[in-house]
């Protein structure tokens, strides 16, 4: 790739005297994290203009289109005023990387100057310029550029003494692509493995053999001979197989035949597909019970881009949660923004299309921000990953007009190699679209294949296959993408209008694998497809046909359209400024055929493409670790411990993240992430209003506790699902009742992220034990979800979450996230977590047990323990139903679930921002603990699941006690004195100022206080 380095340039900088907050942040971070004294830092924007404009037009564009007249000064050509700066760094995008700001500036230029339309190619490019007061040497400037200001995978850097002219325009100049070629698979096994690795196919030897044997088939050879071609796959066909058969798309390990051996019991069982046994095996029986009782809200599960449930006769709710772990490890900002935008497209591409995104969620797992171990080559520091991912999620949601309403952050050293980035989206879809059921998908022979949205480039090539392997320093740059929220917003608005008008038969997104995936998945609906790649709009010339077909360039959808509607849909696209291209037709040939400039580059049998992948056979083992409870000192300071727990990274406030996300856009958020009189108290679940013509809403929550898996993955998975469910119950949700009429709809999404679990005697000798952990996690999911009657509607697995370099492997702990959404009949009856009034009674609901194993407290004490928290569904179901009934009757003033840190944390959090306190005696809790060795410690910090802290106004106390008495005990009152006072059968335990506790909780895990 080549670049133009002398375009016309417009510099937009803050005027002297205007505070440069970005520059101040850079100076602070450089000193704090890199130990570099930059002096004063000034920032500016550089816009390189490729069009031949007069100087007066350039000046007008800068003044009227790109700058604020009060805040900014504009310089055309040269550089911004240096004002004493001695060195600089320019951060621009590499050729071909998405430049949303540049494209927006280009649209502004066209509108402002009334320019004739171009050919769609980018003509304006944006960059950032940093001017430093200090005379910094080149090696220091390089560190600033690569470790703080940008990422070499996606950015171009220039630095040195401040020159007279600063300019950069990343135009792409690719050599002509190599012609399509045939790939000889009649080679040795070693050569097949080398081919798979070099082309980033991520296919194992058995799969390479299957492809080779397919092309040996006499019928296949005869069909290909009739096309006047040899019986060998083309490079495009090999890439299509790799995409379609990738772990990302085919979920081969979740569908494998697994021999599971329990070394503790000596029993061996065979699991024929984790998915069919434990996930579909959970939902299908629940669906049958719902159907038998006349409940019809479970509409579509597992067969589309997202799960669909019925809200009422007019509306459907669509839920999807995806992961974007590998891209976020390479480029945290780009990985996160493409993750959330890509996940938005899943609901948009469900059924016939026409959904409107309602909310986003994000759950993030990072290495600790103060990670002190030496970084491996290619490994980014967790602090940098955290900030990049946070910014990506912020821009992905805020700039798309979608509120980010719920989430969580988990810290653990084992996420320092590869973070886990879970992106969730809920959407509303009309029940009928274009006079037909909205959830149905269909394609007919002769229907047009349209591609709508962004153009295609090299970005994202091999994203699907690359996500199926561990990462290292040699991970391919082409797998990285950067999203465009503006392009996607236009695309979403266009799609909604076109679908509701009845112009679209169905749609799907161009996600992993691009056109190869979207057309390949839709083709069986009609019986075949024919695609012409020369009709696909490109960002730049020089892409090989196979690259065009598998590229994952973002913000694209594939539409199935009756040709009679083509003029109408193209007009809708014009009105929404969305590029739409007619790239082919669906057929009934039984083939996926791909052409470029008249030449056939792929002709594949659809049946073999989708069903020919060999099934895996895997081995899994389990043995419970030999653990004991620690011996603790007798003189522990409970108040000091509580402050430490509140300040710990996994418990401390997330306000430093929450305040940067927009959770209010759309005006439907009822229960927000932080509530209370001063917006400080953390909430258990988000509640949103569905519309403005009634009081119906929904609650969304999540559950994730990977640390429990260090003792027992079964207990971890069960606790995570219970957490997600009880958080919804805490705000006023009701458990579903599959055996009764008139139940409330629920939708749950499972997302498993595990390290490489495929056993290999030398490369992965403990793979069988990691797979054994996954089997236990899935078993727990089925047991708990079945007991609660909550169906799984969609999900995703990510199976290779490892970073390996120089013989060192950093693997994530087995992790599962459950995202759960439930209908709320009346949002006016929902409850928040903070206490409300002096004199209210305080209840602890659910039984506290001696279950400190893997707790936050034990982690702070450097212990693991043995008594892991375990879910007892028989107790939980009764409590959840009784609490929901009491909430519906208006008896509950506040309710907060007990989770990370236990009861003591829940009590403290319930007071935050209220100016109120609690006066409690935990005698009833101690009674339930029996002969626990450290009863007060367990009462305060045990993380037994299925528990709540609730408050009840005096006028409702008798009714509440009659309804909930068997499930909990009253332990005290809310007071006007802002102190947390706790006794144990009269003996003092805690007497703490709640403002001091709030201060501890607001510790910023990145370092410092004042979250």
Positions of the model-derived regions?
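Interaction-mediating elements
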Residues: 39-43, 111-129, 133
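Glycine/proline-enriched, intrinsically flexible loops and inter-domain linkers
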Residues: 96-98, 118, 131-133, 151-1011
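Short, surface-exposed ligand-recognition loops at beta-strand->loop->(often short) alpha-helix junctions
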Residues: 11-22, 53, 90-103, 134-137, ...
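Non-catalytic interaction/regulatory segments
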Residues: 24, 28, 56-71, 99-111, ...
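Short glycine-/aliphatic-rich beta-strand segments at the starts of folded cytosolic domains
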Residues: 3-16, 43-48, 83-95, 126-130, ...
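Short beta-strand-to-loop capping motifs
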Residues: 12-14, 47-55, 91-93, 129-138, ...
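Acidic (E/D-rich), amphipathic helical modules within compact regulatory domains
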Residues: 25-82
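Short, solvent-exposed interaction modules
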Residues: 69-118, 123
């Amino acid at each position: 790739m080549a670049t133009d380095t002398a375009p016309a340039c417009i510099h937009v900088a803050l005027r002297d005297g205007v505070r440069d907050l970005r520059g101040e942040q850079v100076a602070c971070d450089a000193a704090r994290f890199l130990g570099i004294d930059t002096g004063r830092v000034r920032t500016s924007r550089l816009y390189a203009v490729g069009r031949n404009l007069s100087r007066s037009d350039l000046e007008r564009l800068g003044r009227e289109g790109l700058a604020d007249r009060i805040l900014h000064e504009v310089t055309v050509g040269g550089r911004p005023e240096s004002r004493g700066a001695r060195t600089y760094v320019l951060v621009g995008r590499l050729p071909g990387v998405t430049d949303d700001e540049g494209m927006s500036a280009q649209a502004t230029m066209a509108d402002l100057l009334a320019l004739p339309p171009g050919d769609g190619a980018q003509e304006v490019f944006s960059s950032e310029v940093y001017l430093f007061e200090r005379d910094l040497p080149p090696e220091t400037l390089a560190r600033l550029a690569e470790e703080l200001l940008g990422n070499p995978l996606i950015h171009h850097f220039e630095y040195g003494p401040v020159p007279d002219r600063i300019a950069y325009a990343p135009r792409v100049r690719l050599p002509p692509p190599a012609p399509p070629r045939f790939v000889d698979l009649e080679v040795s096994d070693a050569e097949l493995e080398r081919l798979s690795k070099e082309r980033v196919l991520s296919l194992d030897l058995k799969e390479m053999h299957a492809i080779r044997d397919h092309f040996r088939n006499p019928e296949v050879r005869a069909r290909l001979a009739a096309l006047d071609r040899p019986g060998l796959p083309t490079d495009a066909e090999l890439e299509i197989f790799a995409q379609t058969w990738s772990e990302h798309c085919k979920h081969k390990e979740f569908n494998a035949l697994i021999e599971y051996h329990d070394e503790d019991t000596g029993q061996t069982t065979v699991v024929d597909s984790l998915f069919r046994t434990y996930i579909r095996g959970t939902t299908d029986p629940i669906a049958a019970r719902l159907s038998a009782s006349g409940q019809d809200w479970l509409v579509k599960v597992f067969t589309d881009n997202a799960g669909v449930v019925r809200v009422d006769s007019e509306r459907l709710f669509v839920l999807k949660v995806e992961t974007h772990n590998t891209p976020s490890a390479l480029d945290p900002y780009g990985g996160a923004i493409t993750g959330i935008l890509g996940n938005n497209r899943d609901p948009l591409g469900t059924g016939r299309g026409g959904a409107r995104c309602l909310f986003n969620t994000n759950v993030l797992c990072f290495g600790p921000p103060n990670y002190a171990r030496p970084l491996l080559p290619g490994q980014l520091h967790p602090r940098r990953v955290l900030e990049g991912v946070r910014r990506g999620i912020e821009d992905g949601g805020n700039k798309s007009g979608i509120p980010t309403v719920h989430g969580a952050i988990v810290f653990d050293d084992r996420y320092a190699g590869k973070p886990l980035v879970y992106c969730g989206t809920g959407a509303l879809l009309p029940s009928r679209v274009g006079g037909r059921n909205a959830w149905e998908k269909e394609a007919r022979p002769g229907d047009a294949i349209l591609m709508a949205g962004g153009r295609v480039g090299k970005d994202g090539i091999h994203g699907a296959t690359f996500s199926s392997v561990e990462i290292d320093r040699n991970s391919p740059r082409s797998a990285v993408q950067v999203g465009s929220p503006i392009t996607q917003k236009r695309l979403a608005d266009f799609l909604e209008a076109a679908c509701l008008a009845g112009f679209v038969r169905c749609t799907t997104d161009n996600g992993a694998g691009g056109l190869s995936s979207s057309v390949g998945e839709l083709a069986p609906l009609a019986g075949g497809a024919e695609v012409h790649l020369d009709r696909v709009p490109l960002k730049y010339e020089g892409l090989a046909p196979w690259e065009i077909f598998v590229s994952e360039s973002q913000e694209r959808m594939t539409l199935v359209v009756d040709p009679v509607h083509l003029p109408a849909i193209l007009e809708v696209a014009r009105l929404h400024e969305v590029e739409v291209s007619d790239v082919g037709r669906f057929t009934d040939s039984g083939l996926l055929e791909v052409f470029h400039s008249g030449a056939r580059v792929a002709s594949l049998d659809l049946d073999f493409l989708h069903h020919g992948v060999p099934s895996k056979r895997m081995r899994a083992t389990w043995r419970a670790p030999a653990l004991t409870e620690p011996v603790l000192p007798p003189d522990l300071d409970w108040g000091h411990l509580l402050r430490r727990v509140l300040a710990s990274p996994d418990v401390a406030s997330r306000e430093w993240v929450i305040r940067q996300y927009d959770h209010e856009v759309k005006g439907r958020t009822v229960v927000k992430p932080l509530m209370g009189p001063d917006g400080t108290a953390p909430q258990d679940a988000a509640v949103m209003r569905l519309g403005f013509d009634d009081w119906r809403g929904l609650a969304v929550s999540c559950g994730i506790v990977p640390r429990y898996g260090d003792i027992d993955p079964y207990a971890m998975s069960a606790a995570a699902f219970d957490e997600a469910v009880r958080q919804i119950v805490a705000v006023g949700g009701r458990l579903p009742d599959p055996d009764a009429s008139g139940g409330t709809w629920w939708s749950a999404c499972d997302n498993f992220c595990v390290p490489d679990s495929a056993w290999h005697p030398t490369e992965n000798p403990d793979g069988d034990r990691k797979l054994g952990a996954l089997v236990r996690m899935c078993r727990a999911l089925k047991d708990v979800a079945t007991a609660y009657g909550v169906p799984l509607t969609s999900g995703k697995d990510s199976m290779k979450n490892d970073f390996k370099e120089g013989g060192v492997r950093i693997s994530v702990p087995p992790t599962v996230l459950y995202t759960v959404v439930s209908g709320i009949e009346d949002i006016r009856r929902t409850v928040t977590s903070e206490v409300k009034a002096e004199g209210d009674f305080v209840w602890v609901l659910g039984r506290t047990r001696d279950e400190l194993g893997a707790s936050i407290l034990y982690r702070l004490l450097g212990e693991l323990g043995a008594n892991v928290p375990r879910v007892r569904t028989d107790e939980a179901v009764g409590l959840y139903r009784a609490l929901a009934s009491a909430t519906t009757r208006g008896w509950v003033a506040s309710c907060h679930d007990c989770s990370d840190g236990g009861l003591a944390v829940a009590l403290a959090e319930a007071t935050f921002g209220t100016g109120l306190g609690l006066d409690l005696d935990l005698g009833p809790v101690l009674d339930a603990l029996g002969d626990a060795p450290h009863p007060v410690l367990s009462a305060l910090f045990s993380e037994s699941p299925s528990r709540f802290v609730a408050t009840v106004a005096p006028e409702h106390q008798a009714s509440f006690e009659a309804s909930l008495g068997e499930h909990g005990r009253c332990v005290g009152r809310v007071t006007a004195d802002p102190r947390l006072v706790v006794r144990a059968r009269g003996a003092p335990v805690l007497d703490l100022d709640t403002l001091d506790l709030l201060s501890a909780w607001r510790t910023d895990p990145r370092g410092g206080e004042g979250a």
